[in-house]
């Protein structure tokens, strides 16, 4: 009768498991900010400033879209101005012909 000793063989990982993470993604940039410079000539309907909220207010001949984007209502020259002590506004002044 043969008696065999069976070895107690245990295998362990030689590298840590990869695991998972809840990070690793980012939202796309929204390209907010000034789209026309002070003194620049623009046509009617041109976007002047893209923003979230009213960082800059609409002035003369400037409209505000549903997402607070400021756009020119007429063709003219863009002017970024102060509105009171602590606010800013953008206006478009028509070019005299």
Swiss-Prot record:
<keyword id="KW-0687">Ribonucleoprotein</keyword>
<protein>
    <recommendedName>
        <fullName>Large ribosomal subunit protein bL27</fullName>
    </recommendedName>
</protein>
<keyword id="KW-0689">Ribosomal protein</keyword>
<dbReference type="InterPro" id="IPR001684">
    <property type="entry name" value="Ribosomal_bL27"/>
</dbReference>
<dbReference type="InterPro" id="IPR018261">
    <property type="entry name" value="Ribosomal_bL27_CS"/>
</dbReference>
<dbReference type="Pfam" id="PF01016">
    <property type="entry name" value="Ribosomal_L27"/>
</dbReference>
<feature type="region of interest" description="Disordered">
    <location>
        <begin position="14"/>
        <end position="36"/>
    </location>
</feature>
<comment type="similarity">
    <text>Belongs to the bacterial ribosomal protein bL27 family.</text>
</comment>
<dbReference type="GO" id="GO:0003735">
    <property type="term" value="F:structural constituent of ribosome"/>
</dbReference>
<dbReference type="GO" id="GO:0022625">
    <property type="term" value="C:cytosolic large ribosomal subunit"/>
</dbReference>
<dbReference type="GO" id="GO:0006412">
    <property type="term" value="P:translation"/>
</dbReference>
């Amino acid at each position: 009768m043969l008696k065999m000793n069976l070895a107690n063989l245990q295998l362990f990982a030689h590298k840590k498991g990869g695991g998972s993470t809840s990070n690793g993604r980012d939202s796309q940039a929204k390209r907010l900010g000034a789209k026309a410079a002070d003194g620049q000539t623009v046509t009617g309907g041109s976007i002047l400033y893209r923003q979230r909220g009213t960082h800059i207010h609409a002035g003369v001949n400037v409209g505000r879209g549903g997402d607070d984007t400021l756009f020119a209502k007429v063709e003219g020259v863009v002017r970024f101005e102060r509105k009171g002590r602590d606010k800013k506004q953008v206006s478009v002044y028509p070019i005299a012909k």
